[in-house]
């Protein structure tokens, strides 16, 4: 059995989730079992139905559609509970590839139990490849990563007032 490595895609640039989902597609195309947790994301995103159709196990959502900074304490508690339930369910599944999208942001915003997240990452089965995305990852993730790729934004259409486009940004 090959050793599963830890990938970290992080920074303020576009492409972190895109890179992670591209790897999911590659793994599924190679017959691998893929489990994805999308922290703090709800709504429609074009890749999710296709990845599910191809066999990925996907856990996502939040309590409501607000950003965390807009949530009431009750909504934050419900969202945190949902994130922890999703992560616990995901790590109970057999996986060749585990993707934890926005895990760093979930930790930074106290929307996931850090001990559970560390267990998912640091105590995963030996052959399980793991991918995390984050804006500003905690030091323990930077230290643990086998691959650490920083996505840096130099220019983005949003800066010109161009909104996210279906099929491109989501």
Q: PLM features: residue spans?
A:
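Conserved P-loop
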Residues: 2-93
């Amino acid at each position: 059995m090959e050793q599963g490595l830890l990938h970290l895609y992080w920074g303020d640039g576009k492409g972190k989730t895109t890179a992670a989902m591209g790897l999911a597609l590659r793994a599924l195309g190679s017959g691998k079992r893929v489990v994805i947790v999308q922290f703090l994301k709800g709504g429609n995103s074009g890749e999710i139905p296709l990845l599910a159709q191809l066999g990925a196990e996907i856990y996502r959502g939040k309590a409501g559609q607000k950003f965390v900074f807009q949530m009431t304490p009750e909504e934050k508690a419900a969202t945190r509970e949902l994130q922890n339930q999703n992560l616990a369910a995901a790590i109970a599944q057999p996986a060749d590839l585990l993707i934890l999208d926005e895990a760093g942001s979930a930790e930074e915003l106290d929307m996931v139990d850090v001990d559970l997240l560390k267990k998912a990452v640091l105590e995963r089965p030996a052959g399980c490849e793991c991918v995390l995305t984050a804006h500003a990852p905690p030091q323990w993730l930077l230290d643990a990563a086998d691959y650490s790729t920083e996505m840096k934004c130099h220019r983005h259409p949003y800066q010109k007032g161009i909104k996210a486009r279906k099929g491109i940004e989501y």
